[in-house]
């Protein structure tokens, strides 16, 4: 499959995910910055800029995870750490401002954590199975989807720092 076709499919999926986020999140484009000892500061970006940030976060994450998948289990381990952090964040923080049920998101994360652990068991040196483009793009799409639905696209820079640096 050519790179242009892959990017076209990524664009279609990104537009679908961002449209769903716009539909389900009542405050699409409103970002919160937590300032220690001061509280929470809200700022609203224009819709086009918020859409662009979400689009680049999605396509960037998908391609970064795809490029990271070069060695035995490298992308799987990185996504395992990111999903574990998101799960810890969901349990530790209160996301009362979200307009959808977070328990569904937790179930999805637990399912993917289990599948990544099973994959890593068979992907140790010498690897018996490989993730390939389909698996790495799916994991990148999952991470981007979760961050977009939680309105944490800007935090993706810090949490996915290793993946972004390798890309």
Name each model-derived stretch.
Residues 1-165:
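"…together with the soluble PPM/PP2C metallo-phosphatase catalytic core" -> "…together
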